[in-house]
Amino acid sequence: MTENTVSEIERMVVTRVFDAPRELVWKAWTDPKYVMQWWGPKGFTAPVCQMDFRVGGKLLLCMKTPDGYEGWNAVEYHEIVLHEKIVSSMYFSDSEGNRVEPAQLGIEHEAIDGAHDVTIFEDLGNGQTKLTHIGNEPMESAKNSGQMEGWNQILDKVAAVVAELAQAK
């Protein structure tokens, strides 16, 4: 894994505006039954989602590819501001949540040393919410590796979940 420092590199950022109040977007992002519906790019599923959503808590996810490969991710929560912000660290793991280096999985992943993932939920008024996800990888690397495309596909899936929640409200 290549490491760079936080201040010297432009980080991956994806944003999306949802036609729903911030509380619904937050719910879609933080409730495991909804996370299972959107985790992973288009065509991927998330058959396992164990979430302890609190500062110091952990999220363990299995992301299953269309051809059946199961990859695991873990997330540790460092800061949670209700309906506003989540600061976390995401990493590749085994099914028990133990950290696995990307190279062990045959994955090239460039992380910025000391960078956390930050997800911001901004109330735009008029029932709209802007979600901004700042990743721990350099923008250029995220574009080249497909991470950027994957996160945009994830946000498409989040939009579908949010639309369902808004309709049910």
Positions of predicted regions on the chain:
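Hydrophobic ligand-binding cavity/cleft-lining segments
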Residues: 1-45
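Hydrophobic/aromatic beta-strand elements that line small-molecule binding cavities or substrate pockets
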Residues: 16, 48-49, 73-79, 114-123
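Short, highly charged C-terminal tails/helix-capping segments
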Residues: 48, 161-169
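A generic structural micro-feature
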Residues: 6-8, 53, 67-71, 109-113, ...
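Hydrophobic pocket/interface hotspot
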Residues: 25, 35, 59, 77, ...
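Intrinsic-disorder/low-complexity, polar/charged segments enriched in Ser/Thr/Lys/Arg/Asp/Glu/Gln
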Residues: 9-15, 22, 58, 72, ...
